[in-house]
Amino acid sequence: MKNNKGFTLIELLVVVAIIGILAAVGVVAYNGYTKSAKINAAKSNQGQVVKYLAAEIQKCNMGTEDTAMSGGLDCTVSNNASTISAAAETALADFKNPFTPSAAGVVDGANDDKGYTAMVPNDTDGEIVVTTRYDDDDSDASTEEVLSNTVQIE
């Protein structure tokens, strides 16, 4: 009698099928995790830009510093929203768009594209409106998918 050691073809096919099912489930879960991480990164950028603007404006208002925003903003003169927004864009050049990592994440001026944090200065009202579109999935029309904050220039 012949003694065969090894796996049968059926056993090998079952193992390959199980591995295929696990891989398919893993890819779907991984895509969900990466999308969620990008959305959270865009929201985090929004919060950091708003806090940075407020802190640097306050630094100038206190009069303890001659410059703010990594030296890009002269605190010894009166600055309007446009000047502050432009200085902030330069100071925050290291921020990247989570959805397009080769692009800058913070821009001076309106931009509704996904992942960009846009600073729109309003010199008349003395404010900078900071907005971020963190997703463009229109499957749920009831959600705006945009964060917006206003930073006052005092």
Give the predicted meaning of each segment.
Residues I39-G63:
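Extended, polar beta-sheet/loop recognition surfaces of beta-rich domains
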Residues A55-E154:
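Periplasmic/extracellular, small/polar-rich flexible segments of pilin-like filament-forming proteins
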Residues M1-G47:
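Amphipathic alpha-helical segments typified by the pilin-like N-terminal helix
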